[in-house]
Amino acid sequence: MSALRQIAFYGKGGIGKSTTSQNTLAALVEMGQRILIVGCDPKADSTRLILNTKLQDTVLHLAAEAGSVEDLDVADVVKIGYKGIKCTESGGPEPGVGCAGRGVITAINFLEENGAYDDLDYVSYDVLGDVVCGGFAMPIRENKAQEIYIVMSGEMMALYAANNIAKGILKYAHTGGVRLGGLICNERQTDKEVELAEALAGRLGCRLIHFVPRDNGVQHAELRRQTVIQYAPDSKQAGEYRTLATKIHNNSGQGVVPTPITMEDLEEMLMEFGIMKSDEEALAELEAKESAAAN
């Protein structure tokens, strides 16, 4: 039996992280891999496309109903989805009350202690990445996830979040085995997107694992609560996700300790690509507009 691989998909909210991870995992299960998904996002949408359902009941919600997490069985919180993929959602508290990361910690500890990680090839954590606070960093900090894949795009805030996540990985890389597996660029059709993604990967010392092209078929599948792999298995987009899955499967042991950059370096990189103007250029442009308006 091969060693259990614990991977995690991090990325800023709205980047398509959960969609990318679920399509990739659907492709991996077709390759004969045994998988457990642990959703670590308060939206609890990390398993929706695998289960073909609205939202899965979360560990925190079920624990509150039962009285405590100790009153639950694994069967209560782990549901079986597409081709046998096991799914669970950690959940979070009501908005404005408590720490959402607490659900992550509670769920992972419960699953480990109750044998949910037995007889698996992959455990995949789907984690919110706008903030790398204690709870959301738990899969990294506690050496649960060994390979981190950052889902990003050519948009500035996605690049900024990716660099921040790399900082979080670096913080714990030397005390545990966590490594940056690479970047996954989810196309947003911004200027020079592939080049920017490759440039950031170079700065972080990792690889751009795959560039996932934008395709309307993804939305069509999501409306039916399915992955593209299930909804349109013979489509070109399904092929893209299978390629990504194969690359991740072959990337075992290839992770790196990242070399995150400063905000100034990130802005400089954006200016090099003409995505962002320098203060001098912005000021000159403003003065030119004011001068034209005055005349």
Swiss-Prot record:
Source taxon at top rank: Bacteria
Post-translational note: The reversible ADP-ribosylation of Arg-102 inactivates the nitrogenase reductase and regulates nitrogenase activity.
Q: Name one GO biological process term.
A: nitrogen fixation
Question: Which parts of the sequence carry ADP-ribosylarginine?
Answer: R102
> Where ATP is bound, by residue?
G11, K12, G13, G14, I15, G16, K17, S18
Keyword Nucleotide-binding among record annotations: yes
Enzyme Commission number(s): 1.18.6.1
Query: Which Pfam families has this protein been placed in?
Result: Fer4_NifH
Drop me one GO molecular function for this one: ATP binding
Q: Which cofactor does it need?
A: [4Fe-4S] cluster
Q: Which amino acid positions bind [4Fe-4S] cluster, per UniProt?
A: C99, C133
**Cellular component GO terms held in the UniProt record:** nitrogenase complex
Which of UniProt's keywords are assigned here? 4Fe-4S, ADP-ribosylation, ATP-binding, Iron, Iron-sulfur, Metal-binding, Nitrogen fixation, Nucleotide-binding, Oxidoreductase
Q: What does this protein do?
A: The key enzymatic reactions in nitrogen fixation are catalyzed by the nitrogenase complex, which has 2 components: the iron protein and the molybdenum-iron protein.
UniProt protein name: Nitrogenase iron protein
Instruction: Specify the species.
Output: Rhodospirillum rubrum
Gene for this chain: nifH
